[in-house]
Amino acid sequence: MKKFKIGLVGRIILAMVLGMSLGGILPEKVTRVFTTFNGLFSQFLGFIIPLLIVGLVAPAIADIGKKAGRMLLATTALAYIATLISGFASYCTSAGIFPSLIEVGALTQAQAQANDAAPYFTIEIAPLMGVMTALILAFILGLGMANVRGIALHGVFNDFREIIYRTIGKVIIPLLPLFIFGIALNMAYSGQALAILTVFIKIIGVIFVLHIAVLLFQYCVAGLIARRNPLKLLFRMLPAYFTALGTQSSAATIPVTLRQTVANGVNADVAGFVVPLCATIHLSGSTLKIVACAMAIMLMQGVAIDFTQMAGFILMLGVVMVAAPGVPGGAIMAALGVLHSMLGFGDQEQALMIALYIAMDNFGTACNVTGDGALAVIINRFYKS
């Protein structure tokens, strides 16, 4: 008999529902147990994030530099540009729509009236370095490894990257539902749940429409460059889109994406190079979601949204997304450091970001992999021979 298994999205949603349902029922002593766990887990996240940035970004830059063929550089640059366009499109849409959907300062008002359950104890786990220090160190090491012929340091960082992957996949991701449950439980206990849940529903609706618009834009550009019908190109990629909706994994969708990309007239060698690479480095859908969710939470807190601050955040987020691990929730985990250092997000805001992001994980993944087909069409226009 096949064992029934709930996916990460299902576990996150279940954790939120249970937390918000039980917050007004469970005694304070029980709620404080989960608040204590959340405090410890948040400290661990704060410790691991700088290591995550160094462990992912440095070897990613080194790999790109060592394999610096023209097609690789062109694909990487195109993926970064597509990610930035998606991020800025999300910013413009959110800035125009969210103020009419979200009550400014709703979260701050709820927090002011809240009576949070205090943890039984806390343990401070100081990070080894700040997030910006980690980013600068990652750039220096990555560029250095790309220009130094030795393989020893590169081998060390490949092993370090594998340790980070396993820490995310075996420790952080499995504990996320419990972390989200604790956050939702405390929000319901303190009376903040209803305001936040109402906003969540509105945000998800906007992001769903926005990710469709981004795909249409990408294929219009690809069709214009390749002199092809963009709607036909997009229609042929629908099997990859729906496969990604089901699997929530860019890597698992590669065979379908590859097949449909070739069916779109892309040279098999070009498709075989671009599709697996973009499954790792092209995260337009993920960037779209992170920017929109961040702006929604900032509005809920009554924080003034400054374009220059958000522009810097999107530019840095694009770099982090190129190096994000290909595991469920990997993109948002990689983005936590930038959210904290550039937007000032604390533990509760980061937990809300994780919950929102993973609740829509299939939309983002589908947008990412379907967009890979558009990038392949563009690259094929210049490198098909």
Task: Give residue spans per PLM region.
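Juxtamembrane helix-boundary/capping and inter-helix hinge elements in multi-pass membrane proteins
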Residues: 27, 62-70, 99, 146-151, ...
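Hydrophobic transmembrane alpha-helical segments of multi-pass transport and channel proteins
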Residues: 44, 80, 84-88, 208-212, ...
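Helix-loop-helix junctions within the multi-pass membrane cores of secondary transporters/permeases
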Residues: 243-321, 376, 383
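Transmembrane alpha-helical segments and their short flanking loops
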Residues: 291-385
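Membrane-water interface of transmembrane alpha-helices in multipass transporters/channels
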Residues: 33, 73, 193-201, 226-238, ...
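Signature of multi-pass transmembrane helix bundles
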Residues: 2-26, 39-48, 70-232
